[in-house]
Amino acid sequence: MEPFDHGWLDVGQGHRVYYEQCGNPQGKPALYLHGGPGSGCSPRQRRFFDPTVWRAVLFDQRGCGRSTPLGDTAHNHSDALIADIEALRRHLGIERWLVFGGSWGATLAATYAARNRDACSGVLLRGLFLGGRTDIDGFFHGAAALAPEAHEAFMQAIPARWRNRVVVWLDRVFSSGDSARIDRAVLAWRAWEHALGVWPERTVPADPTADEWPLLRARYRVQSHYLAHRCFIGEAKVMDAIARLHGLPVAFVHGTNDLICRPQNAWRAHRTLAGSRLAWAQGAGHDPFHPASLKLLGSALAAHARDGHFDAWPGEPS
């Protein structure tokens, strides 16, 4: 599916965000929010949407992907991203849209929807990340017992005195301007992500190509910036935002084997939010394109497109 429209929106403070619209120009509006933070959107993510049904909007958050300046962390925080989403909605003339995000994108989707309920027809959250210290520390250390060799290799790239404050060290490295240190950190972080299943299409990381290097440096610079500041939201505010979604159609999809975002995140959020639905992607990790995850996401989108809610979707009611 190719975009029928794309462009860059000037959101102020020196930032221009890339956006694209795919599918049916007269279809039901939906916004997809990518994860990371820092990852940017990819053509694969268009596959979530039935092109005959949805007018799907994807955009690269500040500093990510095709947005400019690439990798810029100035004026780059969660409140700015939420304002950008609203600016994009108004720019595109959309009254209400389904907001769909995965991982960090789910964090952002929930927070945006809580502040802009009237702009949302529903919320679909996949692999929920809560943005607190438990999640962040868990990402760097929680899976060490399951991938001990990969974790040891990752820790060897980090000075011993920083191994209990990995994200602070990474933020300093990516802000240092020292290209050699930055590139070593890119390779170490990327290898650890591969071990946890963030990059499912390749079991062993190939060396980055010349085209990939700038995007990887930007990705991890933005990600370290956000994680060092607990994504400028923190777990308590994310859970409060989820509680304030009461009355909106909300569905959660989470992989039972997710090593990046703990399954209990989805369970806690679901139990907090009366009327929400939760479905477990059996055997899936963090990869949204695992067959079990992809099937559930597709059925959730189809249910919302048909009914305007998730009540008849297979997920468990809260």
Placement of each model-derived feature along the sequence:
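Short beta-strand/loop motif that positions the catalytic acidic residue
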Residues: 245-246, 252-254
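A catalytic-pocket lid/entrance helix-loop region that shapes and gates access to the active site
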Residues: 120-169
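N-terminal cap/lid segment of alpha/beta-hydrolase-fold proteins
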Residues: 1-16, 223
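Catalytic active-site module of serine/aspartate enzymes centered on a nucleophile-bearing elbow/loop
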Residues: 277-318
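Conserved alpha/beta-hydrolase "acid-adjacent" motif
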Residues: 259-265
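Conserved hydrolase catalytic core segment
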Residues: 95-134
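Conserved HGGG/HGGXW glycine-rich cap/lid loop of the alpha/beta-hydrolase fold
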Residues: 11-69
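Conserved acidic catalytic loop of the alpha/beta-hydrolase fold
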Residues: 79-97
